[in-house]
Amino acid sequence: HCDCQLVLAGGGADDDPEGAEVLREVEEAAAKDPDIHVLLLPPFSDLEINALVRGSTIVFQKSIREGFGLTVSEGLWKGKPVIGGAVGGIRLQIINGVTGFLIHSPEGAANRAVELLSNPELCRKLGENGQRYVRENFLITRHVKDYLLLMLALDHPGERVVQLAGI
């Protein structure tokens, strides 16, 4: 077993009818383990979330349904490997075994966490890969470049290849 702490951080969702009951169950279970901490954060807790992610070794996003959850991109951008449920937009952000791990069960998440905590070099490598992946695919600079290339292509309709110099 690894010497670690689990921090479950987030806020309530008004559009989640089961959320309050699930939260109660999580708090009840967490109260039995001194290494599990539940943090209920108010809206606009960006600084706290930033500090938690930066201080983490691994970021988890074990949703059973999820759009493009920013938790995953935030973790990757900060150089943390992310363990996430293989659902929705999470699958667009985690490259399994390259930037983190896609999992299908709590047991799978636990196994991958032990693997990462036992292998700091793998943790570092996945974190670096994740940061690069976010830089190349999800930052606004990438989108600006794509739009500039589109405008250049429209301005040069006969050319097959259009490039931006230095980008």
Task: List the predicted regions and their residue ranges.
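Aromatic "clamp/platform" in nucleotide-sugar-dependent glycosyltransferases that forms part
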Residues: I64
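Short alpha-helical donor nucleotide-sugar binding micro-motif in glycosyltransferases
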Residues: N50-S56
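Conserved acidic donor-binding segment of nucleotide-sugar-dependent glycosyltransferases
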Residues: N96-E107, E115-P120
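Short alpha-helical segment that forms part of, or immediately flanks, the ligand-binding pocket
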Residues: N50, S73-W77, R91-L92, V98
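Nucleotide-activated donor-binding/catalytic signature segment of Leloir-type glycosyltransferases, i.e.
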Residues: G10, G19-L47
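A short, well-ordered alpha-helix in the C-terminal region of glycosyltransferases
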Residues: E115, L122-E136, H143-L149, A153
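A short hydrophobic beta-strand element within the catalytic core of glycosyltransferases
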Residues: V59-F60
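Short hydrophobic beta-strand element within catalytic cores of glycosyltransferases
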Residues: P81-G84, I94
